[in-house]
Each structure stands twice: as structure tokens, then as C-alpha cells.
């Protein structure tokens, strides 16, 4: 893995009402994405659905997300970024029912992953990585996806214990060889 190559943090994060943390202005995954970008000097890009999930009702948000999952939907996303120039892509998302949100697959399917190193990181409320890294590996054809080496941080920790979250991010990045 080329830890000195050009790096990108691409992520999806939900704001508004969230499970276990109430109404938030800054999404759990966004917080972790920013920490990774700050520590590694990586560029950062948000994967944003063209039609945002509802912010006022978490129940409505998860209903829509569950419908997308059941339909194997590929919801449109806002804009795009050319990943060709990047060697390493940190890919972040919340774990919803043991799956990345479907907009992550929309992003993945728009790109050629040959020769890229993809490093998943997730936020969750108790389920951990739950095999989502393996699903990312199956979707990112031609990439070296670091399954079993991703980072999983509880959303509540990201929101309410940022010093702990930052320590976890720093230790993880050091273990991967990105920081000293």
C-alpha cells in the first residue's frame, strides 16, 4: 500500500435526528472523515444524495433508507469527484442494517477502482463493521480493499467523546502506517 500516495476521504453522513444522539448538525461519519483528512492531509469529499434523507424524523429517514435497500436502489448523488488521481481512498458511511447506505453503491459504480487501495471506516451504534467491508470489497472491482482493517466508531462516541474518537482514529492510522 502506498501510504505516501495521493489520498481522498469520501464519505456519506446523515445530519438531523439520528439514533442514540438526537438532533445533530454535524453527522457522525463527517466528524470521523474530517479527523482522517486532518491527520493524513487527504482531500475530502462528501457523497450527498440528490434527494437528501429527512432530517426532522429519524423514523422517516430509516424508512426511506430501508426501502432503498430492499429495492437494491441506486439513489442519484450530487456531483462527483474524479478519483483517477488518488491512490488511497478512505470510504466512510454509517452502518445501516449491516449495509452501507445505497448512495455509497451509486458512488462506487460510477468509478474505475483498478489499482486503488480502499479503506472503509464506519459509524454505528453497536453493530460494528458487520461485514460491510466485505460488501465494499465485492463492489470495488479491481481495488485492494483492506477488509478486516477498517475503522468502526460508535456515533455517540463521535458526537459526545471526540477526544476518544480522535485517539481511536490516530491509533488506527498509525497501525496502517499513515502516521507516526
Regions found by a protein language model. Give the residues of each.
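N-terminal beta1-alpha1-beta2 submodule of the flavodoxin-like/Rossmannoid cofactor-binding fold
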Residues: 1-88, 98, 105, 167-180
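Glycine-rich phosphate/pyrophosphate-binding loop and the adjoining helix
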Residues: 144-180
Amino acid at each position: 500500500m502506498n501510504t505516501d500516495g495521493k489520498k481522498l476521504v469520501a464519505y456519506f453522513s446523515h445530519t438531523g435526528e439520528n439514533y442514540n444522539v438526537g438532533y445533530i448538525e454535524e453527522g457522525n461519519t463527517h466528524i470521523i472523515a474530517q479527523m482522517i483528512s486532518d491527520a493524513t492531509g487527504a482531500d475530502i469529499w462528501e457523497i450527498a444524495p440528490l434527494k437528501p434523507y429527512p432530517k426532522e424524523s429519524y423514523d422517516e429517514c430509516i424508512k426511506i433508507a430501508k426501502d432503498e435497500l430492499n429495492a437494491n436502489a441506486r439513489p442519484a448523488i450530487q456531483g462527483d469527484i474524479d478519483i483517477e488521481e488518488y491512490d488511497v481512498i478512505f470510504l466512510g458511511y454509517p452502518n445501516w442494517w449491516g449495509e452501507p447506505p445505497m448512495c455509497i453503491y451509486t458512488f462506487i459504480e460510477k468509478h474505475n477502482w483498478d489499482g486503488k487501495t480502499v479503506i472503509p471506516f464506519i459509524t454505528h451504534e453497536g453493530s460494528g463493521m458487520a461485514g460491510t467491508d466485505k460488501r465494499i470489497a465485492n463492489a470495488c472491482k479491481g481495488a485492494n480493499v483492506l477488509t478486516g482493517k477498517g475503522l468502526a466508531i460508535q456515533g455517540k462516541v463521535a458526537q459526545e467523546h471526540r477526544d476518544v474518537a480522535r485517539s481511536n482514529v490516530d491509533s488506527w492510522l498509525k497501525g496502517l502506517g499513515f502516521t507516526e
